[in-house]
Every structure is written in structure tokens, then in C-alpha cells.
Amino acid sequence: MLSSCRAVTSMSRWSKHKKTKEVISMLSHNQKPNSWKILWRLIKSVQGRTSSKVLYVMVCAIFGILTGVTNSILLAQGLGFIFPTTNTETDGIQSVYLLVFAHNLPVMERLTIVCVTVVVAYILIFSFNVAQNYLGLKLYQEICALLRWKAYLKIQSMSTSFFDTQNNGDLMSRLTNDVYNINNLYAQVGGQTIQSLFILMTTATILFVLSPVIALISLTVLIALIALSFLFLKKARAAYAKVQNNLGDMSGYIEEVLSNHKVVHVLKLQEVMIDNFDKYNRPMVNPTIKANTYAVFIYSWFGFISNITYLASISIATAFSVNNIPSFGVSAINYSFMLSYIAALRQTALPLNQIFSLWNLIQLGIVSGERVFKILDLESPQKQATITKLPNIKGNIRFEKVVFGYSADKPILTGIDFSVKHGDIVAIVGPTGAGKSTIINLLMKFYKPFAGKIYMDNFEISEVSETAWREKISIVLQDPFLFSGTIKENIRMGRQDATDEEIIEACKVANAHDFIMRLPQGYNTFISNKTDYLSVGERQLLTIARAVIRNAPVLLLDEATSSIDVHSEKLIQQSIGRLMKDKTSFIISHRLSIIRNATLIIVINDGKVLEMGNHEQLMRQNGFYARLKRSAVK
């Protein structure tokens, strides 16, 4: 929980060059990613789902495609069936019509037969497309929910030091915006890709059946022109990557400012924050324009090469017909052949054209996939602990020559030694920056010391899992934090199996029961960290009740009574007094009344223990503690 001072410091870092942040970030782009590998991982994510669901989508897509292609050919050849030429020989699919239906039927009856056949095909196409879209969307939503859950799980498994170097807004953007882009890739492009593969195989087969020579020439021209498109794809992807990275930076800035809006208003920083926002907003413009320009160009380019391919095919077929060159296929080169061939060729180019029209979604999906996979590929802290469950702990705490710093080149604690017995009330005293909160952070196992050892009873901290270690510790921070939910649910966060009766008793111990009962819905009143009808003191009493229900043998109080009014302070001190009973308590506070009652005061400065003793002993020594207290009184 950040204090106001830390909030201002945190916001000020946005004014630094963002390159500094990229260097320290574990999610920064240190190497050029491979788009095909990312795309393959996205495909494997689909493959990893229930095979039957994937099969249903593919079956619907295949039948829809086959019906559509067949319908196009039936429609083209049906014209020849309706209006037969004087040639007694019939080619291609016209023969099918004549075999099924009498060739001597009147024109209107022939028209009816063709129309009914085509309408039935359209109904089948519609049915298969609806089924494919529904099943596909359901499948893709499940995949994205799984990706989002895995990414969130990975983030939750990371150590506290990970969050010291990460942009929270960027993490949120990866879990929301990037997963949304992946969903669009699956929903818009996934089904289209399945269709495209089978359309290409089906129509290519039809083209080669009609005329293998002309088909080979047409497809060669088409493939050669498509190959030129890949010259622009790398540039387009780089532009989209820049857009997403800038969006993550901007999201981080917005999250930081909005979460500290009170500090911004108190310090009248609105204009400064607006100017800083523009530094993140404006860089979004040019990369976005550039990325979309590439997408439009690629789409238009493919439309151009499709038309060139059609023209080339017609020219070649005409040349074959004029020079009496056989088609080497099942049909002679005539009017019906041209209709069938161009229809099949259009069906070949159409899915590719549709994919190129969605190229912006493809690039965004690949870039977003890379950003999400960077989270999934993070190495979780190594679980070296061999003890996953601690027995009943008394709460004896011992530091042995502990050395630690938030950066390797700047140690904050240098050889901390002290020993605390069960039931002691320990006050940690020192000037700002001496390392008081760092000791609390190490006790909570948020960080690993560079050197030295920390013991709880006879268990060394590195041998115990984080969960088992923290089960034995309760903490009350300077800034009370409330979860979104009812008061009862908030208190139960301290211990999930607590009964309603235990929650009420804990609130009575914490002096919170009376004001809770004055609320309209009592313990079922909905609150959140932004609730404004609870005072700071009342919010702190709720966090104390949460610590009471936890009933851990070690208690940490980090400035728990600062910024509290006199009436609330008395209630909080009473509740803390009850809470500390039969516990080993560590207190960080500037209030003399709280420090005076400590059984042991540890005085630290510049990362070292200078003095230890109770208040009277340290005052008689007339050392650093005595000078610190006299200066505080002045």
C-alpha cells in the first residue's frame, strides 16, 4: 500500500525516459520475435482444447465450403443446361443435370430445377455457416479465457520484486486488450483460415480437372504476386508492435494517475499530468496510421493481383481456344468452360482476399500473442522450500547478519542482528530511509536477503514455503485496504474458514462491531477500497479485525495509527493492545506513546542496529535514540 509520499514519487518516474523502464522490465522486448512461432503457439492453443469441439467447427466449415463451391459450379453450368447450345455434346456438370433430369424439358422447367437446386445449396450454406460461427465463437472464447487465466495465474505466482519493475497498467493491458485482440484473431481469422485451406484444395482440384495446364499457369502467376506481399508484412508487424507497446505504456500512466487522483488535485498537478499524458498519447498516432496504411495497401494490392490473375487466365484460355490447343481437362474450352473456370478461380482467390482484408487483425493478434506469451514464459520464483506446513509456532524471531538491498549495488541493511522472544513487543525506530519497512518486508518474505539468515523459532526462512511462512504472520499497514465485497467477506479474508460468530467476535475485539451495526445492512454492507462513508479510522479497525481473525503468532504493525483522529486512535490502540496479547509484535511508529510500551526497542540507522533496549534504558544511555526522541519533541 503506497503512502501519499510514495505515490508522488511513483508518479514522478513517468517523467523519466521510458527506455530506463524498458531496460529493467522483465517483459521488455530484448530480441526480435518470430511471427510464425507465435502464430503456431496460437494455433496450438486451439489444438489443446477439447478435440470434439475443434472437430465440430472444422466439419461445419468443410461442409459449408464444399456446398458453396459446388453451388458456384452448379450455377455456372446450370446456365448451359437452361440454354443448351446446338452442340449435341455436353461437357462438365451439364451432364449431371441431363443424367438426373430429362434433357427435353421446357426452358422454364429447367430454370425451376436449377433455381431449386441452388436455393437448397444456399440453405445448406447458411446452416453450416451459422453452426460454424456459433461453435467457433464458443471455442475461441474458452481459449481466450484460458489464456487470460494462465497469464493471471503466472502474474500471481511472481515475487514482489517482479512488481517493483513492472508497469501495472501494461500488465492490465496484456490481460485485457491483448487477449481481446487474440480473440478477434481467432473469431475473425480462425474460421476464415479453415475455410481458406479447404477452398484452396477444392478449387485447385477443380481448376486442374478443368484444365491442368491453364490452372498451373494461373496459380503460378497468383503465387508469384502474393510472394511480393511479404515484403511489406514485416514492416506492418513492426508498426503494430509499436502501437501495442505504446498502448501498454499509456495504460500504465493512466492507471498510475487515476489511482492517485487525490494527490494530483492536492498538489495542483493537473496541468503537469495532462502534459505528461500527451507524451504517451501523441506517439500512438503515427504508428497507428502507419500500421493501418500497410493493412489497406496489402488489401488493395491483393485485389489488384487477383484481377491480374483473372485477366491472365482469360487471355491464356482464349489463346488456347483460338489456336485449337486442347485444355487437357474434362471440358473443351468454350463459354461454359470459361464460366466454370473463372468461378473456380474466383473461389480460389476470394478466401485469400478476405484474409488480406483482415490483415490488421492478424498483425494485432500476433503482436498481442507475443505480449501475452511473454507473461506465460516468465520464470516463476524457484520453489526451494522443503517445508510446506509449519507446526504450532511460538513466534521467536531471529535475524543473523542479514544483508539486503532493493538493488544489488545499494544495500539498505548491512549485517542486521537481533533476537526476539515469544510475546515481545518490538518497536523498530530510526530516521526515514534507515530500513525499518525493509525489515518488515523481509519478515513477510517479500524479498530474499543477499546474505544472512532469518529464523521463526528454529525454522530458517529459505526452507519454508511462502504460504506456510505467511500463515504465521498478521499485518496491519498504514493505509488500510478493503476488498470489494461485504464487511463479512472482508473480515473473512483473514481466514477463509472463519464462521460468522468468529467474525463478529473478532470485530468486537477490534472495536469495530458498534459502528458496523449502525450501518444499514450491518455485516452485509457492501464496501470497497473507494468507500467514502467509512472514516480512515473505521477502515483501519476493519483491517485489525482481519488480523484478529487470522490469529497468527507474529504480528506486524507498520504505522497503523498514523493519520488517525484522536477518538479513532484510542479505539485502535485498545484493539491493538488486545490483538498483541500472546503474540510476537513488531511495530513501526513515530508515536511516543506506542513506542514507550514496547518491551524491546531496536534502533537502526544506515542499515545497522545501533542500540537495543526498552525506552528507559535507551534514554539513560543518552545515545542515538535519546537524541531522536528529543528532536521529535522539539
Swiss-Prot record:
InterPro entries: AAA+_ATPase, ABC1_TM_dom, ABC1_TM_sf, ABC_transporter-like_ATP-bd, ABC_transporter-like_CS, P-loop_NTPase, Type_1_exporter. It is found in: Cell membrane. The keyword Endoplasmic reticulum does not apply. Its main location: membrane. Residues 54-364 form the ABC transmembrane type-1 domain. GO terms for molecular function: ABC-type transporter activity; ATP binding; ATP hydrolysis activity; ATPase-coupled lipid transmembrane transporter activity. GO terms for cellular component: plasma membrane. It is a multi-pass membrane protein. The chain crosses the membrane at residues 54-74, 111-131, 189-209, 213-233, 296-316, 325-345. Keywords: ATP-binding, Cell membrane, Membrane, Nucleotide-binding, Transmembrane, Transmembrane helix, Transport. It holds the Pfam family ABC_membrane. Residues 397-631 form the ABC transporter domain. The keyword Membrane applies. Belongs to the ABC transporter superfamily. This is Putative ABC transporter ATP-binding protein MG015 homolog. It comes from Mycoplasma pneumoniae (strain ATCC 29342 / M129 / Subtype 1) (Mycoplasmoides pneumoniae).
